Amino acid sequence: MTALKNDRFLRALLKQPVDVTPVWMMRQAGRYLPEYRASRAKAGDFMSLCMNPQFACEVTLQPLERYPLDAAILFSDILTIPDAMGLGLYFETGEGPRFKKVISTPADIEALLIPDPQKDLGYVMDAVSTIRRELNGRVPLIGFSGSPWTLATYMVEGGSSKDFRKTKAMAYDNPQALHLLLDKLAQSVTSYLNGQILAGAQAVQIFDTWGGNLSAAAYQEFSLAYMRKIVSGLIREHDGRKVPVILFTKNGGLWLESIAEAGADALGLDWTCEIGDARRRVGDKVALQGNMDPTVLYAKPEAIRNEVARILASYGKGTGHVFNLGHGITPEVDPEHAGVFINAVHELSAQYHQ
């Protein structure tokens, strides 16, 4: 494979020296970009965009044409796995993702098959290899998946949920059934991420979007235990390089110490954590990724730069920090403001790496 021209993202994740703090944005290929909206209109709908490797490659690269980002992230959706398990993913306008079939009984769980990455999710593997080829070593490519708990919530609720009442009821009424579902999902995520790594992903991130909605005890049992299982089964070296793993539990700031023991190289932080405090707590074990509040991008450029400067100062000197937002960039953000953010990270962080 082509040698990387810019590897500071991978180096920071492995706590190796860097010249400036690397930066990328969750959902950097997304609706805030007019070129993304044009591609989506051309594709017809969101699923057609995801399932066509050429379109997925096109939108993955769009933010890199605009901004000096230090990583690309595969354009896909976390719900590709349940879709490949036969649940029938579709998107309702204004409603978000829905499933034609819902998991409600132990028999439904027993019937689920673990998808084969090549046969059942081949369009994702093709997208990864296409993007990797088109990047031509410019920056590393991140692969990703949802966490078992987060995927389970969509499968049991039938889509997005405010309170996860069905999934949480299952956790307390029938924990054996939920554990069977989570175990199948952990196996599926492991093979899916390993498929992405073999296809060319140079780092992987597990998005545990809804783990932070659990109690502390339930988080350990129903979310973290399964992410730990996945991490232990991942390919950690490929193509002559280490493949770093990032775990991101939104609203997981209370549990950083136990997440840091899960075996990943880095933890993603949402904006409710103070990154300097997180570094003092777990920085000896893992790198940190984050964690500006995405809504800061609605503020004036000077305010964006000030907040970048504050977060950099909070983290302090040395490597082990990948700058990111604390969650995905939102559709109404002015693309110019995203550019201010990315340039500020590079410009203002050099002093911390001398």
Swiss-Prot record:
EC number(s) from the headed UniProt entry = 4.1.1.37
EC category: lyase
Matches recorded under SUPFAM superfamilies: UROD/MetE-like
Give the record's pathway: Porphyrin-containing compound metabolism; protoporphyrin-IX biosynthesis; coproporphyrinogen-III from 5-aminolevulinate: step 4/4
Its Gene Ontology biological processes?
Answer: protoporphyrinogen IX biosynthetic process from glutamate
| CC annotations in GO | cytosol
Annotated keywords: Cytoplasm, Decarboxylase, Lyase, Porphyrin biosynthesis
Tell me any Pfam family this protein matches: URO-D
Read off the Gene3D superfamilies from this record: 3.20.20.210
Task: Give the location in the cell.
Answer: Cytoplasm
Its UniProt entry gives the catalysed reaction(s) as: uroporphyrinogen III + 4 H(+) = coproporphyrinogen III + 4 CO2
Q: Name the positions where substrate binds.
A: R27, Q28, A29, G30, R31, D77, Y154, T209, H327
Q: How does it assemble?
A: Homodimer.
Briefly, what is this protein's role?
Catalyzes the decarboxylation of four acetate groups of uroporphyrinogen-III to yield coproporphyrinogen-III.
Q: Which PANTHER family match?
A: METHYLTETRAHYDROFOLATE:HOMOCYSTEINE METHYLTRANSFERASE RELATED, UROPORPHYRINOGEN DECARBOXYLASE
Membership in a protein family:
Belongs to the uroporphyrinogen decarboxylase family.
Under the heading NCBIfam families, the entry gives: hemE
Protein name, as recorded: Uroporphyrinogen decarboxylase
What is this protein's gene name? Answer: hemE
